C-alpha cells in the first residue's frame, strides 16, 4: 500500500498569534523576536515578508527593509500553549505524528481510514475554530514531497503531489528546494552549472557521493521522488539550550560567563523537569563580524546540575581564542537520556560480578 504522508506548517505562527491576540496588529507588518535592533527575527507576518523580512534576519536589517514594521518581543509560553492545543487535533486523526517544531509536524494517515482531503478539511476547520489560525498542508507518498507540497500555496494552502506528477513538479525547481541542500552545497552545484533539479537529475550517482559524501545517495533519491524515511512517533528531544544576542558587543569574559550561568540554570531546570540528563556540552559564539564558532565537549558522565553544566561551559569558553568582540553567546546540552547512565569503574565492575 502506498503511504499517505501529510506535512502541516502553521502559517507565520508567532506573528499570527500576536495578530490574533491583538486585533490592532491585523493586516500590519509584524516582526517577532527582537525589539532592540540587536536581536534576530523569529517570525515575520506575511505583510512584513513583502518587504523582504524573513526569519533569522538581524533585526537591524529588518528595520532597514521595513522601517514602519511593528516589532514585538517573543512570548514563547504563549506559543507553546497554542501549539499544544493545535497538536491535539493531529492526534485526533492518528497516533502516527512526528512533531518537527512548535509549529510543524508530519502525520502518517495511511491507516486512518479517511479520505485525505476530508482529513485536511477537518484539520483546517478545527484549527480555525479552536485557535483562529491557519495552516498550509502538503500531502504526498513520502516526507520530502509532503513538505515540498506544504510550501506550495502559502498561506492557508493545500497541495497534493502524486507519483505521476513528479517530473512536472520537481524538474523545473531550483536545487535549493531539495531538503538537505544548504548554501554551500547549492554553491558547489552552481559552480558546475547546475541550477535546477532538471540539471541535477542528469548527474551520475558517483558525483553525488563525491560532492555530498554520506548524504549523496539521499539527495540523488530525493530528486527522483524517493524518500523512505518513516514518520517518527515520539521522536526524542535531542538537545536543550539557549542563546541570546548581547546588549552590546563585548570581549569581557566575566560578562559573557554571566550569560552562561543564566543559561546553565534554565537548562538544568528544563532537564530536571523532564527527568533527563545530558552528556555533550556545546558553547556557541558569534562575533561582531557575524562569524560563528562552536565548540563541544562530551563528558564521561551524564549531568543535569546547573553547577556542573556551568563549570564545563566555562572550560569550553576559556579554551576558545576570542579575538573580536562578541555579539551572541549560546549554550546547549545534547546527547540526552531519560536515565542517568553511570560509567562503572573497573573496581565497581569487578565487585558487581562477584556479588
Language-model features and meaning:
Residues 1-211, 216-217, 339-355:
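Gly/Gly-Pro- and Ser/Thr-rich, intrinsically disordered tail segments characteristic of DNA damage-repair
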Amino acid at each position: 500500500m502506498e503511504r499517505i504522508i501529510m506535512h502541516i506548517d502553521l502559517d507565520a505562527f508567532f506573528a499570527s498569534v500576536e495578530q490574533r491576540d491583538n486585533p490592532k496588529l491585523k493586516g500590519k507588518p509584524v516582526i517577532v523576536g527582537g525589539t532592540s535592533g540587536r536581536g534576530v527575527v523569529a517570525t515575520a507576518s506575511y505583510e512584513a515578508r513583502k518587504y523582504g523580512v524573513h526569519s533569522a534576519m538581524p533585526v537591524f536589517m529588518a528595520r532597514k527593509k521595513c522601517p514602519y514594521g511593528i516589532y514585538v518581543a517573543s512570548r514563547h509560553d504563549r506559543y507553546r500553549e497554542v501549539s499544544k492545543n493545535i497538536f491535539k487535533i493531529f492526534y485526533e486523526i492518528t497516533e502516527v505524528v512526528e512533531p518537527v517544531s512548535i509549529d510543524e509536524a508530519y502525520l502518517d494517515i495511511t491507516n486512518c481510514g479517511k479520505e485525505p482531503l476530508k482529513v485536511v478539511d477537518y484539520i483546517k476547520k478545527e484549527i480555525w475554530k479552536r485557535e483562529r489560525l491557519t495552516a498550509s498542508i502538503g500531502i504526498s507518498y513520502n516526507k520530502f514531497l509532503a513538505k515540498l507540497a506544504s510550501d506550495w500555496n502559502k498561506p492557508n494552502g493545500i497541495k497534493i503531489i502524486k507519483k505521476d506528477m513528479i517530473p512536472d513538479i520537481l524538474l523545473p525547481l531550483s536545487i535549493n528546494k531539495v531538503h538537505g541542500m544548504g548554501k554551500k552545497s547549492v554553491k558547489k552545484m552552481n559552480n558546475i552549472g547546475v541550477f535546477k533539479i532538471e540539471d541535477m537529475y542528469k548527474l551520475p550517482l558517483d558525483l553525488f557521493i563525491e560532492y555530498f559524501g554520506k548524504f549523496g545517495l539521499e539527495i540523488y533519491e530525493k530528486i527522483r521522488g524517493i524518500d523512505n524515511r518513516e514518520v517518527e512517533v515520539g521522536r526524542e528531544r535531542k538537545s536543550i539550550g539557549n542563546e541570546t544576542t548581547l546588549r552590546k558587543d563585548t570581549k569581557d569574559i566575566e560578562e559573557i560567563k554571566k550569560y552562561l550561568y543564566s543559561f546553565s540554570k534554565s537548562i538544568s531546570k528544563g532537564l530536571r523537569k523532564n527527568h533527563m540528563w545530558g552528556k555533550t556540552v556545546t558553547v556557541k559564539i558569534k562575533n561582531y563580524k557575524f562569524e560563528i564558532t562552536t565548540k563541544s565537549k562530551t563528558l564521561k558522565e551524564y549531568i543535569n546540575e546547573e553547577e556542573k553544566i556551568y563549570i564545563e561551559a566555562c572550560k569550553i569558553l576559556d579554551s576558545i581564542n576570542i579575538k573580536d568582540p562578541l555579539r551572541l553567546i549560546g549554550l546547549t546540552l545534547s546527547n540526552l537520556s531519560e536515565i542517568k547512565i553511570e560509567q562503572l569503574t573497573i573496581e565497581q565492575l569487578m565487585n558487581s560480578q562477584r556479588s
